[in-house]
Amino acid sequence: ENVYSTDYGWGLFKDDEKGGSGKASATKYKRTYTWNESNQLVSSVDDNYSTAYIYGQDGQRSNKYTANSETLYFNKMWTHHTDSGNSVYGGQSAKNIYLGETRIVTKLNSGTNPTYQEEYYKQYYYHSDHLGSASLISDYKGDEYQRIEYTPYGETWVEKTSNTGLEWLPYKFTAKELDEETGLYYYGA
């Protein structure tokens, strides 16, 4: 009788969880994706998010927009996220350091003039499995920050994050970015 939808925890709810009647409508959980002629995702719309994606001439994602935020992708080594709300992620830049094609460190900082301490304390080291997936992420001291296990097709099976930080680290299965709004991985293909 009840209709449920799951999107790996990205906010699709059953009516009565939000104070509604308890009678669920199948169309309430609808998400619409739109692709361009190059088969690139250009928009995703549901009850919680309306997200637009823009790509550069090289075919790689250059911008992601929602009603409250914007993410700029300068290259695989640097992204910048702005948020008009009171989110802890607003004004956050991520610098990625690679060894060959393998991401080994992400350094996070906020604002236009980050302090040395902020850059030092907000660096996260990736310990990857045979697919390149982040299975263990450690902090600047080498302590476990996040542990992730996956099903064979990339769904997060177990995720344990230390309660000492609030950083959203999107690089997960096969070292690709997990899009928070859709629950899809961006492979850049």
Task: Cite the ranges covered by each PLM segment.
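A motif-centric feature for acidic-aromatic and gly/ser/thr-rich catalytic loops and repeats
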Residues: Y8-L12, G111-G188
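A short glycine-rich beta-turn/N-cap micro-motif
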Residues: E1-Y4, Y8-K23, Y29, W35-S43, ...
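Detector for glycine-centered tight turns/loop "hinges" at secondary-structure junctions
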Residues: G59, N68-S69, S84-N86, G142, ...
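C-terminal, low-complexity/hydrophilic appendages and adjacent surface loops
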Residues: Y89-Q92, G100
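Short glycine/proline-rich turn/loop motifs
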Residues: E17, R103-E118
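Glycine-centered tight beta-turn/hairpin loop motif at sheet-sheet or coil-to-beta transitions
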Residues: A26-K28, D46-N48, A67-S69, G91, ...
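Short, surface-exposed beta-strand/loop micro-motifs that present aromatic residues
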Residues: S93-I97, Y124
